[in-house]
């Protein structure tokens, strides 16, 4: 019997319904969030131990990013295996690689850290890291709404305004002594997230930070820096929050001017232009036995132990042939070691407990696009997915990752068709948001996405419940 986790055991049916309609009304009142998910009457409650896990995870992941950054830089210089940088650079334009390696940006790592965490029967598992995540504004808005439902008694993780205030603190730390405002640049490719970023910019202004969400084409370049028109007044830009993907740079108006301004120190840009730090194959590098001495030296013992526990086994799907006597490290089909990727094509459904997905730098590398779950596919389709991944290596490397099944949660949501609150059995993705300010990490909030139990890939969808997380009270 899998563990279940109810969230609103003390609410009457009428009270639960009223709370859902209040949430829907508040969201509708923003005129920004088209509610395309199921609304729960309560936040998802985590235990004190689970909160402790997430509080400790942020510093561990910052250490991981710093270690990955060092590993890449040392690989470029030949101080670590050169194949590390070769893999992380695969499929990237040379101009971007040279820019990312500039001395000015050498120590920069993402200031927003958001792992996707799956609660399983055996503990938490991180499926991937996202340094350009959506959901910041949405999680901030939901945190405010659910906090207000209980007049602050629900103990929302991060607090009512934790997402906004910690995001503002992170941006101020990047601004340092630079004059000017914050420009949240949202590309056309990311336009679905523009409403929440507009809302977030408004909240930042209420916190006293001059911040504006604009399209890249709206900014103006001069030799003195970047400018934007806000409320009828032209303002210098001190910080650019990059809400666009690096693979999309050729489609970003004025992208080269933004890079030039950052190179000259006229503006700070975060997340940094470092494609090596946005590859899912980083998890494969963490588990690679040749690199274990590096990680053990780079990370503190507790950090190494915890990350080994939560980062799933991952392999980069490189089609290069292995010597006849070699095997792929720690990859097995049952008791059998795997020496060739083609061995996986004939794996049974039970043996296909794997996920194939693009490593990064591709429009297929976010959301559920490009993801193939082995045991959820007929054998022929699994073979096709594997062969396609291997064939894509020159331009878009793919990874193979061990699949971990989420544990079941019993949730309640507002069924619009029935005009009633009903129960759903689902599996959960927890997305904690960490913001880095002056070298320290703060957990600002956690968004729960509860998908129907039959879904293998957990992501935002119309059949999913989205809710902030709170601390379970006794």
What are the roles of these predicted feature ranges?
Residues 1-474:
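Preference for protein termini
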């Amino acid at each position: 019997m899998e563990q279940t986790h109810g969230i609103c055991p003390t609410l009457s049916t009428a009270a639960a319904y009223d709370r859902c309609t209040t949430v829907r009304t508040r969201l509708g009142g923003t005129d920004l969030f088209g509610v395309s998910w199921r609304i729960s009457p309560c936040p998802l409650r985590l235990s004190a131990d689970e909160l402790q896990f997430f509080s400790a995870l942020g510093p561990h992941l910052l250490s991981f990013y710093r270690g990955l950054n060092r590993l890449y830089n040392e690989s470029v210089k030949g101080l670590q295996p050169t194949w590390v940088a070769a893999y992380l650079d695969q499929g990237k334009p040379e101009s971007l690689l040279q820019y990312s390696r500039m001395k000015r940006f050498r120590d920069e790592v993402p200031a927003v850290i958001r792992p996707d965490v799956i609660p399983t029967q055996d503990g938490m598992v991180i499926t991937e890291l996202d340094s350009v995540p959506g959901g910041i504004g949405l999680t901030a808005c939901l945190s405010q709404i659910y906090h207000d439902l209980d007049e602050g008694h629900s103990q929302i993780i991060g607090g009512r305004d934790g997402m906004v205030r910690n995001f503002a603190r992170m941006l101020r730390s990047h601004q340092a002594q630079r004059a000017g405002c914050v420009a949240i640049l949202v590309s056309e490719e990311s336009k679905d997230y523009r409403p929440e970023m507009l809302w977030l910019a408004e909240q930042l202004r209420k916190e006293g930070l001059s911040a504006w969400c604009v399209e890249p084409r709206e900014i103006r370049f001069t030799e003195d820096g970047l400018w934007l028109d806000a409320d009828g007044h032209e303002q210098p830009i001190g910080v650019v929050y990059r809400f666009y993907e690096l693979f999309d740079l050729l489609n970003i108006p004025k992208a080269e001017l933004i890079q030039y301004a950052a190179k000259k120190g006229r503006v700070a840009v975060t997340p940094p232009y470092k494609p090596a730090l946005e590859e899912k194959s980083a998890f494969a590098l963490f588990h690679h036995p040749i690199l274990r001495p590096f990680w053990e030296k780079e990370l503190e013992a507790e950090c190494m132990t915890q990350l080994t526990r939560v980062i799933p086994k991952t392999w980069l799907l490189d089609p290069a042939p292995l010597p006849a006597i070699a095997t792929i490290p720690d990859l097995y089909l049952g008791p059998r070691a795997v020496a060739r990727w083609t061995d996986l094509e004939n794996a049974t459904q039970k043996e296909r407990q794997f996920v194939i997905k693009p490593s990064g730098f591709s429009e297929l590398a976010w959301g559920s696009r490009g993801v193939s779950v082995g045991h959820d596919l007929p054998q022929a389709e699994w073979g096709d997915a594997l062969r396609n991944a291997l064939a894509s290596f020159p331009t878009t490397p793919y990874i193979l990752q061990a699949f971990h099944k989420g544990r079941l949660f019993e949730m309640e949501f507002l069924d619009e068709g029935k005009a009633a609150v009903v129960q759903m059995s689902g599996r959960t993705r927890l997305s904690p948001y960490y913001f880095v300010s002056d070298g320290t990490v703060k957990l600002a909030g956690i968004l729960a996405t509860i998908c129907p139990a039959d879904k293998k890939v957990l992501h935002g969808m119309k059949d999913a419940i989205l809710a902030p997380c709170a601390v379970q009270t006794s």
